[in-house]
UniProtKB/Swiss-Prot annotation:
Family: Belongs to the thermophilic archaeal actin family.
Function as written in the Swiss-Prot or TrEMBL entry: Polymerizes into bundles of filaments, forming a helix with a filament width of 5.5 nm and an axial repeating unit of 5.5 nm. Polymerization of Ta0583 requires NTP and is optimal with ATP, but GTP, UTP, CTP, and even the deoxy form of NTP can also support the polymerization reaction. Nucleoside diphosphate or AMP-PNP does not support polymerization.
InterPro entries: ALP_N, ATPase_NBD, MreB-like_C
Note, other: Mg(2+) is required for polymerization. 4 mM MgCl(2) is sufficient to enhance the polymerization; however, higher concentrations of MgCl(2) suppresses polymerization. Polymerization is also suppressed by addition of NaCl, KCl or CaCl(2), with half suppression by about 100 mM, 10 mM and 18 mM, respectively.
Designated name of the protein: Archaeal actin homolog
Binding site for ATP: 10-14, 179, 231, 285-288, 311
MF annotations from Gene Ontology: ATP binding
Keyword ATP-binding in record: yes
Dependence of activity on temperature: Optimum temperature is 50-56 degrees Celsius for the polymerization reaction.
UniProt keyword terms in alphabetical order: ATP-binding, Nucleotide-binding
Domain of life: Archaea
pH dependence of function: Optimum pH is 4.5-5.5 for the polymerization reaction.
Phosphoprotein listed as a keyword: no
Length: 326
């Protein structure tokens, strides 16, 4: 029995595979009819219907026909299915074409949790997913169980197991800064149960900063910059149209504004319960950029996570939850 942790986000898909192997790729895919080549050689082309419909995914999928998941953790969505197939393909599970029994740990935001879990189990549990690779090789994944946890709980469980946070009186607030949204999950640190009335989703994410930077670069160069290039330009300068654009000096004010909006909304939603917060836990890719600012919400409570774990915290927790369920 193989166990994987899977976090299908609107921005990126994260996987914890065999022997703890970590994989991350942009959550986008596109149908293709021909073989493609890049600088590094042949671009991976997969199929889930015996080769009739082929698709490319991740950084290789670009252009007007790309498809993305409908939201974080929407595993039952037809737009997420190729991403699940790609994640399992890259997870390090190899076989001779016969089905490999698999348990998937995953999650979805608390607000739609029950609905999404029911749909995901109906779509995936006790199903055999057959994936055909670029050389015609076939791998079959028999999904025997799907273990779901609310987004943010996975990260908290992982940190608890690592000894980074402790069970104690008070609240832990997991702030997951994603592409479209910032999901805030408040957990009672004594029993690790979500506090529903203090958990919420903000329609603010790193995508807002990327769009703002993209507009700024377009004004400077006269050309519309691709989304993935603008995303890269948030953290360091990049070359675009033979000109160096972006970088911290340009993106700094934009990220400051993003952090201010998130902090203001979190304070508003937590209302008079801020004094009970003992751990602020930023996770997600956006936390690499603005996570340190969140200490302003409750000074002295910020939990520092290794930068390499920030994006994978939920997936690590999902995998741990799946292992514990066996």
């Amino acid at each position: 029995m193989v166990v994987v942790g899977l976090d299908v986000g609107y921005g990126d898909t994260k996987v914890i595979g065999v022997d703890g192997k970590r994989i991350i790729f942009p959550s986008r895919w596109a149908v293709t009819e021909t073989e493609s080549w890049g600088i590094g050689g042949k671009i991976p082309v997969l199929s889930t219907d015996g080769g009739q419909t082929k698709f490319i995914y991740g950084k290789y999928a670009s252009g007007n026909n790309i498809r993305v998941p409908q939201g974080d953790g929407r595993l039952a969505s037809k737009e997420a299915f190729p991403l699940i197939a790609a994640a399992l393909w890259e997870s390090g599970i190899h076989n001779d074409g016969s089905p490999v029994d698999l348990v998937i740990g995953s999650g979805t935001p608390l607000g739609t949790f029950d609905l999404e879990v029911k749909a995901a189990k109906e779509a995936l549990e006790n199903k055999v997913l057959t994936v055909t690779g670029p050389e015609g090789e076939v791998r079959q994944f028999n999904i025997t169980r799907l273990i779901m946890r609310p987004q943010g709980v996975g990260a908290a469980l992982y940190l608890l197991n690592q000894g980074i946070i402790e069970q104690q009186p008070g609240y832990g607030v997991v702030i997951d800064v994603g592409s479209r949204t910032t999901d805030v999950l408040t957990i009672n640190l004594m029993d690790m149960e979500p506090v529903v009335e203090l958990s919420f989703s903000l329609q603010i994410g790193v995508g807002d900063a990327i769009s703002a930077l993209s507009r700024k670069i377009a004004k400077e160069t006269g050309f519309v910059v691709p989304f993935d290039l603008a995303q890269e330009a948030l953290s360091h300068p990049v070359m675009f149209r033979q000109k160096q654009v972006g970088g911290p000096e340009v993106s700094g004010p934009i990220l400051e504004d993003l952090a201010n909006r998130i902090i203001e909304n979190i304070r508003l939603n937590l209302r008079g319960e801020v004094d009970r917060v003992t751990s602020l836990i930023p996770v997600g890719g956006g936390s690499n950029l603005i996570g340190d600012r969140f200490e302003e919400i409750a000074p002295g409570t910020l939990v520092k996570i290794k930068p390499e774990d920030l994006q994978f915290a939920n997936a690590l927790g999902y995998r741990d939850a799946a292992e514990r369920s066996m």
